[in-house]
Curated annotation (Swiss-Prot):
One of its GO terms (biological process) is peptidoglycan biosynthetic process. It comes from the Bacteria. Belongs to the phosphohexose mutase family. Gene3D superfamilies: Alpha-D-Glucose-1,6-Bisphosphate, subunit A, domain 3 (3.40.120.10), Alpha-D-phosphohexomutase, C-terminal domain (3.30.310.50). Catalyzes the conversion of glucosamine-6-phosphate to glucosamine-1-phosphate. It comes from Nocardia farcinica (strain IFM 10152). The active site is at S100. Keywords: Isomerase, Magnesium, Metal-binding, Phosphoprotein. This is Phosphoglucosamine mutase. The modification Phosphoserine is found at S100. One of its GO terms (molecular function) is phosphomannomutase activity. Its cofactor is Mg(2+). InterPro entries: A-D-PHexomutase_a/b/a-I, A-D-PHexomutase_a/b/a-I/II/III, A-D-PHexomutase_a/b/a-II, A-D-PHexomutase_a/b/a-III, A-D-PHexomutase_C, A-D-PHexomutase_C_sf, A-D-PHexomutase_CS, Alpha-D-phosphohexomutase_SF. It catalyses: alpha-D-glucosamine 1-phosphate = D-glucosamine 6-phosphate.
Amino acid sequence: MGRLFGTDGVRGLANGSLSPELALRVSGAAAQVLGRGKTRALALVGRDPRASGEMLEAAVTAGLTAAGVNVLSVGVLPTPAVAYLTGLYDACLGVMISASHNPMPDNGIKIFAAGGHKLDDAVEDRIEALVAADDPVRPTGAGIGRVLNASGARDHGLHIPDQYSVEGTHERYVEHLVEATGRDLSGLTVVVDCANGAAAEVGPAAYREAGATVIAINAEPDGLNINDGCGSTHLDQVRRAVVEHGADLGLAHDGDADRCLAVAADGSVVDGDAILAVLAIAMKESGELAQDTLVATVMSNLGLHLAMRAAGIAVRTTAVGDRYVLEELRAGGYTLGGEQSGHVVFPKYGTTGDGVLTGLKLMARMAQTGRSLADLAGVLTTVPQVLVNVPVSDKAAVAAAPDVREAVADAERELGDSGRILLRPSGTEQLVRVMVEATDPVKAEQLAADLAKLVASL
């Protein structure tokens, strides 16, 4: 068995590589590691609406309860909501069943530790070791975990706030988002593409509660249509809708709503780098940007670094994945970080990327300044970037192949100071990602094509 955990949990083809049996073993191992030594341990379980979620939730619940941990299901909610509620309800772990932006046939298991924090590598290694050993601890009798509702959880001595019920988790999360926004959004009209995913209910509700006029699209999940030509990886629909409705902006989420990309009134795309630039400058002005520092990943465009330098903001760089962004935020005491893909983390309000909160904060900046999104995003001039995703059978071996490393070194020498190259295995899919940035867009296209051709040949 290869490594189970990727950049963001365990993912695979539902009922294929991600089988119910594997889901049971992973959740049982997680319960042993994260629930060890805790009496009346509680796990929260949520999911996105893809069809396989119900099957995998049943398997995860079986694994957790078989390990002696009680389970509280919060139903279909965004990943950041599950993380937030894990902390709010004082659970020893939370589980989100989702493959995020991946196609519907895939699914995944994201695990949060107490407080809603993502797992570090050492904890993942301990869970993987238990899965590989396949010798689970199995209590009997009263030691078996129970599947609880809110009142039942309180009857078992678990910490579920009296004013909240499982049925009210959506409302509580929306309240949390609106409180964090801190500004009335009346007068702004937004098109929200919910990707037929976990944001379909809470996304439009939060934007409306904050005062905005909301036009929701792709907000009718049926289990099969999640991410199907919509959401943050397919922006054509939201771009058209913004122009057709004369909206001030559009916001696009992915299947589990932990990311957000934006569209200006003219239909132009505002990516995660531009969103980070706008929010970092806003927080610097308000004194909320700790140490005048933004945390970004190696995938962020060179243009972000140049824009932040001009604004007097330092940039700390991490590996790809919002878990690594969060680790750097916590280690340095910083207050804003994120990725070009639209994961933005506000550690004051949550422990993972939150797409809906990102959209609310972006709109709050528009309301505060009275400026259009295109005007605000103009602070960043993107250096031409080409990203090619190359399907391969063994992503780690191909990315580390001597021929590939030599070709990358040659291309870097050719670019000199006028660009950069990043070639890495995807953390979530069987792909090698080839990214080339260069002030000469023709040069960027050619180098990316040459490297992608080499990768595909191996």
